[in-house]
């Protein structure tokens, strides 16, 4: 896959504080990774729906966009410089993490997991049930 070199540097370089992100995203039941060339972005999806998106903003800053609840995200935006209303997506439903700025790992892990949970909650029941079976029996 031809990932953008700058985005790759922040996510996949073992010196990066954020090198855990791809593994965490892919550890979630039913999650897949894909590179969307037309967006020059790495997408993490569950049942076809995006829960995480790695891209650059117009200034070339690497970002991780995550689905979020505005009530939960707003205090985090105020507390951490690395977190802000999402770039190029609904500011009401998405948060951006600047990958070139620091944010505590436990906060990032929580935001990724919460993003996944919000997306899964919006899936039809049949698809949610399938993901529940996958999480309890990953060999299915």
Q: Predicted segment positions?
A:
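Charge-dense, helix-prone N-terminal extensions
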Residues: 2-140
């Amino acid at each position: 896959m031809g990932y953008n070199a700058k985005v790759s540097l922040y996510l996949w370089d073992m010196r990066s504080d954020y090198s855990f992100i791809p593994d965490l995203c892919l550890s979630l039941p039913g999650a897949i990774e894909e590179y969307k060339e037309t967006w020059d972005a790495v997408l993490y999806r569950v049942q076809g729906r995006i829960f995480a998106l790695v891209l650059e903003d117009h200034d070339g800053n690497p970002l991780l966009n995550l689905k979020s609840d505005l009530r939960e995200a707003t205090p985090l935006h105020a507390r951490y410089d690395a977190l802000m209303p999402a770039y190029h997506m609904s500011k009401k439903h998405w948060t951006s993490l600047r990958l070139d700025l620091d944010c505590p790992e436990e906060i990032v892990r929580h935001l990724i997991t919460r993003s996944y949970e919000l997306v899964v909650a919006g899936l039809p029941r049949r698809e949610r049930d399938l993901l529940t079976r996958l999480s309890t029996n990953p060999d299915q």
